[in-house]
Amino acid sequence: MEGGPAVCCQDPRAELVERVAAIDVTHLEEADGGPEPTRNGVDPPPRARAASVIPGSTSRLLPARPSLSARKLSLQERPAGSYLEAQAGPYATGPASHISPRAWRRPTIESHHVAISDAEDCVQLNQYKLQSEIGKGAYGVVRLAYNESEDRHYAMKVLSKKKLLKQYGFPRRPPPRGSQAAQGGPAKQLLPLERVYQEIAILKKLDHVNVVKLIEVLDDPAEDNLYLVFDLLRKGPVMEVPCDKPFSEEQARLYLRDVILGLEYLHCQKIVHRDIKPSNLLLGDDGHVKIADFGVSNQFEGNDAQLSSTAGTPAFMAPEAISDSGQSFSGKALDVWATGVTLYCFVYGKCPFIDDFILALHRKIKNEPVVFPEEPEISEELKDLILKMLDKNPETRIGVPDIKLHPWVTKNGEEPLPSEEEHCSVVEVTEEEVKNSVRLIPSWTTVILVKSMLRKRSFGNPFEPQARREERSMSAPGNLLVKEGFGEGGKSPELPGVQEDEAAS
């Protein structure tokens, strides 16, 4: 593409696009020449730079994708590490194979300029060539996006700000850390759009091997859309529930280790997910599970989120979340319960509590004991862990730190997981980062995308072929494995949504 525009074909709007693209090129180049930010407390290596041509402008330098070997440094390979070496397969999360979340990963792209071109079968937004639609939903659509300079595909989500703001922000959260509220003073009241930008600023800085990565956000202040670019995980959900072929106990153990580390990282960042389930656990090309979909998540102050409303997927809800007591409940304990249901699904291919009717399902969750089928047979240690995770009393339910030490998880101590200090560092967001959490698109340019990307309103799993979606019934009888809390349309397992209360300190 050297010497020519990065467009699919020539268009009558090309001259206007070129003129807009040429604005502030000098400022743009100066902005690109700034110091490289650190990632998760680790200084990045020098970046290789690759030219990407923007219509009507000089070549703009974009970061080249780092090699995989630069990002997969095992915690146990550190000289100071104390973990035992172990032989493990490509999906192992044991000592010899776990990828360090603190190893450098490429920073979130900051787009200082946007150029759009349109053709009958192609739309290009900056360096992204938008391809097939891979998901549709109540809040927007998901398109496959190809970055030519990196030769890499991403998932671009186009979200409706009107629908987001109708639900008072996505995900809803209290004021940022360090505010007066955190110091015992009066809480700062945030406008809905401010909440959106603050949460985007947090999500952009989350950097963990077991959490889906947000790459870039673009915003058109005069139009209804936010454009979010995420890592594309082609393998999709780790499991569809129900299924006839559940995982072996060993495979379930390896996947659970990934989920627990990702969950501990989120809790360290003071985020409760609130919708852990197999369809929100996506499998990366490296064989590791990554937590996705923060549509009903909450961020909290203090040690834990104190919640008072129900959200998430009925079959994965904890007893206290569906209680009529009116009392607040622990956000962390909710995540542990949902992870326990997920672990049960891993080994049995179905949820522990199933019913066609929501009230009957709630009654079973609150009152009935966990039943272990005769087939497949599982170990007593695994049964012990499941029962502790599905303890109906949140006060006595096992926590993430104790799950990490459980004999079934560690193979009786032979394969310990890294400590919180080794794989978590707290993300802090400054006011400047919140202000710059999105890049603005000139309003006239997005008319093309509005017409080409917002044609349909209902959607399913963005990583699932359409034919398969039509053939497969919903995940559970009565659609009780489908997320609650959305008044308009369905929701993809990986599309952000917005239906939550405020988390109390």
From Swiss-Prot:
UniProt KW keywords: ATP-binding, Calmodulin-binding, Cytoplasm, Kinase, Methylation, Nucleotide-binding, Nucleus, Phosphoprotein, Serine/threonine-protein kinase, Transferase
Biological function: Calcium/calmodulin-dependent protein kinase that belongs to a proposed calcium-triggered signaling cascade involved in a number of cellular processes. Phosphorylates CAMK1, CAMK1D, CAMK1G and CAMK4. Involved in regulating cell apoptosis. Promotes cell survival by phosphorylating AKT1/PKB that inhibits pro-apoptotic BAD/Bcl2-antagonist of cell death.
Annotated organism of origin: Homo sapiens
Taxon lineage: Eukaryota, Metazoa, Chordata, Craniata, Vertebrata
Signal sequence residues: none
Region (Disordered): 26-61, 460-505
Record GO terms (molecular function): ATP binding; calcium/calmodulin-dependent protein kinase activity; calmodulin binding; protein serine kinase activity
GO cellular component, one term: cytosol
Gene3D superfamilies membership: Phosphorylase Kinase, domain 1, Transferase(Phosphotransferase) domain 1
Subcellular location: Cytoplasm; Nucleus
SUPFAM superfamilies: Protein kinase-like (PK-like) (SSF56112)
Activity regulation statement: Activated by Ca(2+)/calmodulin. Binding of calmodulin may relieve intrasteric autoinhibition. Partially inhibited upon phosphorylation by PRCAKA/PKA. May be regulated through phosphorylation by CAMK1 and CAMK4.
PTM text: Appears to be autophosphorylated in a Ca(2+)/calmodulin-dependent manner. Phosphorylated at multiple sites by PRCAKA/PKA. Phosphorylation of Ser-458 is blocked upon binding to Ca(2+)/calmodulin. In vitro, phosphorylated by CAMK1 and CAMK4.
Active site: D275 (proton acceptor)
Start and end residues of each Protein kinase domain: 128-409
Region (RP domain): 167-189
Chain positions with Phosphothreonine modification: T108
Name of the protein: Calcium/calmodulin-dependent protein kinase kinase 1
UniProt xrefs under PANTHER family: CALCIUM/CALMODULIN-DEPENDENT PROTEIN KINASE KINASE-RELATED (PTHR43895), CALCIUM_CALMODULIN DEPENDENT PROTEIN KINASE KINASE 1 (PTHR43895:SF26)
Residues recorded with modification Asymmetric dimethylarginine: R78
EC number: 2.7.11.17
